[in-house]
């Protein structure tokens, strides 16, 4: 009889971040669970940071991936929202306490006991592994319905990148009045989605970048209204005080002062890029211009479902490069160089093939340790 708990994926075993085949176990499908056969999984920049331990809290082995689209193959007896055969998604979080102030406000992403899809532990102590694998078992409250008309492959990155830009647009008032001016700093995996969603909300969008390399693409294909090169001092001077909002997606070290100068009085800058080192925060421009700096971390489950419906309605998807699982390490190398337009997505179902040289991951919940062995 086939072991229904067996799973297969690609894991990083140390800070080199090199991914290799792994066999491991998923928990049995419980009464509140949905088992998902993974079809596609997006490659997020945070996957790269985590497998290389850039943030200092990685626990190996790690199977990354939190932009998952697949098919429900089993549902628990208490699950009424989903049925076998449904197309579903799993994003950045797969658990929370369900009782704190944040959870009661549909902000599970800010729950102090939030459980992430990978490099995290569930309440029973088991290590969670992500979507660079063939199957995942998730509490139904953290499973999303993929709307008709939203492609499985190019829709997958919306489960992280999409909600990461959608949520702050709603919270910081960017959607209340069309015609407001939004600056998007950085045109990468987050930035190109921010342009599309911003335009769908009726904003006038300016892409802010260090070079003019992507100018025509940003305007002609992505729909941006204008393009501002930060190294062009004359254009930067002309743009002072013209923007109501800026979404800063850049995860590399950069100066905030030039961005503050672009904001109108009472303008808002929302930082989304997760940097390894803190940025300098100039206070004078904030005080003298009543300007605001804020942050945002993905979104709750209700808002994420809302975002998916919004993107389906407006035909918003990520621009992707579809890759095989065996190409993941070279894709990570390219991601470091920003050599992708604009998101890698792994064709899991058609390329994840077991190998006889793979390792077995055995998890010992009682002691909270993992032991690997060859087979």
Swiss-Prot record:
GO molecular function terms noted in the UniProt entry: cinnamyl-alcohol dehydrogenase activity; coniferyl-alcohol dehydrogenase activity; zinc ion binding
Gene3D superfamilies: Medium-chain alcohol dehydrogenases, catalytic domain, NAD(P)-binding Rossmann-like Domain
Cross-referenced CDD domains: CAD1 (cd05283)
Cofactor: how and how many bound: Binds 2 Zn(2+) ions per subunit.
Xref: InterPro entries: ADH-like_C, ADH-like_N, ADH_Zn_CS, CAD-like, GroES-like_sf, NAD(P)-bd_dom_sf, PKS_ER
Record flagged with keyword DNA damage: no
Chain residues that bind NADP(+): 46, 164, 186-191, 209-214, 249, 273, 296-298
Cofactor(s) for this UniProt protein: Zn(2+)
Pathway: Aromatic compound metabolism; phenylpropanoid biosynthesis
Transmembrane parts of this sequence: none
EC numbers on record: 1.1.1.195
Keywords assigned by UniProt, alphabetized: Lignin biosynthesis, Metal-binding, NADP, Oxidoreductase, Zinc
Expressing tissues: Expressed in the root tips. Expressed in the apical meristematic regions, leaf veins and at the base of the trichomes. Expressed at the base of the stems. Expressed in the abscission zones of newly formed siliques.
GO BP terms: lignin biosynthetic process
Positions contributing to Zn(2+) 1 binding: 44, 66-67, 160
Signal peptide stretch: none
Any Pfam family matching the protein: ADH_zinc_N
Binding site for Zn(2+) 2: 97, 100, 103, 111
Positions of disulphide bridges: none
Reactions catalysed: (E)-cinnamyl alcohol + NADP(+) = (E)-cinnamaldehyde + NADPH + H(+); (E)-coniferol + NADP(+) = (E)-coniferaldehyde + NADPH + H(+); (E)-sinapyl alcohol + NADP(+) = (E)-sinapaldehyde + NADPH + H(+); (E)-4-coumaroyl alcohol + NADP(+) = (E)-4-coumaraldehyde + NADPH + H(+)
Keyword DNA repair in annotation: no
Description of how the protein assembles with itself and partners: Homodimer.
Function: Involved in lignin biosynthesis. Catalyzes the final step specific for the production of lignin monomers. Catalyzes the NADPH-dependent reduction of coniferaldehyde, 5-hydroxyconiferaldehyde, sinapaldehyde, 4-coumaraldehyde and caffeyl aldehyde to their respective alcohols.
Family to which the UniProt record says this protein belongs: Belongs to the zinc-containing alcohol dehydrogenase family.
Protein name per UniProt: Cinnamyl alcohol dehydrogenase 3
Organism: Arabidopsis thaliana (Mouse-ear cress)
Lineage: Eukaryota, Viridiplantae, Streptophyta, Embryophyta, Tracheophyta
């Amino acid at each position: 009889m086939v072991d229904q708990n067996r799973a297969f994926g690609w894991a990083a075993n140390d800070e080199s971040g090199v991914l290799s085949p792994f066999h491991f176990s998923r928990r049995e499908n419980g009464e509140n669970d949905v088992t998902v056969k993974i079809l596609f999984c997006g490659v997020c920049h945070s996957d790269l940071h985590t497998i290389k331990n850039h943030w200092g809290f990685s626990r190996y082995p790690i199977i990354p991936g939190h932009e998952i689209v697949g098919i429900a193959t089993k549902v628990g007896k208490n699950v009424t929202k989903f049925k076998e055969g449904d197309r579903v998604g799993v994003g950045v979080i797969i658990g929370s306490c369900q009782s704190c102030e944040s959870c009661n406000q549909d902000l599970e992403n800010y729950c102090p006991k939030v459980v992430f899809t990978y490099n995290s532990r569930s309440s029973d102590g088991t290590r969670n592994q992500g979507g660079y694998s063939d199957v995942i078992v998730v509490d139904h409250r953290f499973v999303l319905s993929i709307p008709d008309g939203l492609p499985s492959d190019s829709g997958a990155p919306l489960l992280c990148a999409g909600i990461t830009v959608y949520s702050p647009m709603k919270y910081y008032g960017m959607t209340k009045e069309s015609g407001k001016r939004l600056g998007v700093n950085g045109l990468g995996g987050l930035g190109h989605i921010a342009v599309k969603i911003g335009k769908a909300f009726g904003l006038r969008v300016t892409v802010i970048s260090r070079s003019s390399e992507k100018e025509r693409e940003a305007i002609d294909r992505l729909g941006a209204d204008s393009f501002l090169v930060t190294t062009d001092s004359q254009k930067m001077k002309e743009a002072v005080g013209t923007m109501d909002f800026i979404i800063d997606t850049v995860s590399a070290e950069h100066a905030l002062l030039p961005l503050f100068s672009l904001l109108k009085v009472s303008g808002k800058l929302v930082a989304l890029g997760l940097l390894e080192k803190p940025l300098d925060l100039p206070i004078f421009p904030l005080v003298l211009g009543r300007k605001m700096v804020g942050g945002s971390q993905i979104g709750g489950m209700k808002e994420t479902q809302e975002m998916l419906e919004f993107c389906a309605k407006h035909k918003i998807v990520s621009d992707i490069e579809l890759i095989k699982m065996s190409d993941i390490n070279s894709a990570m190398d390219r991601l470091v160089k920003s050599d992708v337009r604009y998101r890698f997505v792994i064709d899991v179902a058609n390329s994840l093939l077991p190998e006889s040289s793979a390792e077995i991951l055995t998890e010992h919940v009682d002691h909270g340790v993992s032991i690997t062995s060859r087979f």
